[in-house]
Regions:
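A short, basic N-terminal segment
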Residues: 1-54
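Conserved catalytic segments around the Walker B and adjacent sensor/switch elements
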Residues: 56-58, 80-94, 187
Length: 355
């Protein structure tokens, strides 16, 4: 007699072995297809091992193609083999002012007496600690900094260092002061998108880390790999792997079928790689305003926002641009009798037909 329940999950069973392996910040033991980039990053750090000043590096490329994870892998390798070099990692999306950056540096070097001290005072204390050794500074999402003076301070006042600037925005380097560029003298490293074979290989590696054996039907996995390559963002693929597995688990099934990957792809219309918890309070307020007024122009939105908030129009425009970069909103260009203007809509404008 056939077992009608052999393909059903029991209460204690799960498709997942290690779901953390599908998180965007997860650090795999091996970073495939980025050996050349990691060696280049390491070469900029190498002079620090010889008690000399390191090279500064501007790292750029599209979102979700391994810039941060490859950099962190190099730092992890350095920590395991050369633990005497101080490492400072700052995400400038979260720490976007000189004060916030310096406060984070103080925390990472173990200086705790930060209350009622100004930015310059805090940096002076951090400098005294950092100049006793060599330091690697990683400023991730550096384009989110509201003020680049902190980079200038690091360049001028920290003796032996390597500064790694990471951004999705290739042209950001052209927006900073020439005086800073002349002191940074950065080298440039572009992370190019993964090709189709590499994309499939990365997702296959994550499947091995995250799931029990043989849970994905080949057609379902291939469809996810194809969609990920099309969108050129590995984070999208991780979302699809996780979502399709959750759909199968909700049905108590042991196999992830093509229909579940298709259902997961439909959910991409509401998916944003940048979690809203990373937004600042004013950005959350602006996002809530857009939700209630989707389709209005930036000028009209500012008119509503400024009724209860004190924020310059130029700063408001910058916040709108940051939300667009984070894929929380979409800007659309329009033209009327008075010229060009932009309207703002919530989330990703792609419809299910686009998928």
């Amino acid at each position: 007699m056939s077992n009608l329940f052999k393909d059903m999950l029991k209460d204690s069973e799960s498709l997942f072995k290690n779901p953390i392996a599908l998180d965007y910040d997860y650090q795999p033991k091996l970073i495939p297809y980025r050996d050349n980039e990691q060696h280049y990053i390491a070469s900029c750090i190498k002079p620090l091992l010889q008690d000399r000043n390191g090279k500064n590096l501007f790292i750029f490329g599209k979102p979700g193609i391994g810039k941060t994870v490859a950099t962190k892998h190099v730092l992890q390798d350095l920590e395991e083999n050369e633990g005497e070099i101080q490492q400072i990692y700052i995400n400038c999306w979260k720490k976007d002012t000189p004060y916030k950056v310096v406060l984070e540096i103080c925390e990472q070097v173990g200086y705790k007496w930060t209350q009622q001290k100004k930015t310059d005072e805090l940096f002076q204390k951090a400098k005294e600690i950092l100049n006793k050794t060599s330091t690697i500074f990683v400023l991730d999402e550096v384009d989110k900094l509201q003020d680049t003076s902190i980079i200038y301070s690091i360049v001028e006042d920290i003796y032996k260092k390597t500064i790694l600037l990471i951004t999705n925005e290739k042209d950001w380097i052209n927006t900073i002061d020439n005086r800073l560029i002349s002191r940074l003298i950065p080298e440039f490293l572009e992370f190019k998108p993964y090709n189709q074979e590499e994309t499939k290989g990365i997702l296959k590696q994550r499947v091995q880390y995250a799931f029990n054996q043989n849970v994905f039907e080949e057609k379902a996995f291939n469809q996810i790999a194809e969609k990920t390559f099309e969108l050129q963002d590995i984070r999208t693929g991780l979302f699809l792997l996780k979502e399709s597995a959750l759909i199968a688990e909700n049905k108590s099934l042991k196999k992830i079928k093509l229909e579940y990957s298709e259902e997961a792809i439909k959910k991409l219309a509401t998916f944003t790689p940048k979690d809203k918890k990373h937004l600042q309070e004013d950005e959350k307020q602006i996002l809530a305003l857009i939700k209630d007024n989707s389709g209005k122009s930036i000028k009209d939105l500012y008119g509503i926002y400024s009724l209860n908030n004190n924020l310059a129009y130029r700063t408001f425009q910058k916040k709108i641009k940051q939300l667009e970069t984070a894929k929380q909103i979409t800007l659309k260009d329009h033209k009327d009798g008075w010229g060009y203007y932009k309207t703002v809509e919530l989330g990703n404008l792609k419809t299910l037909k686009d998928y």
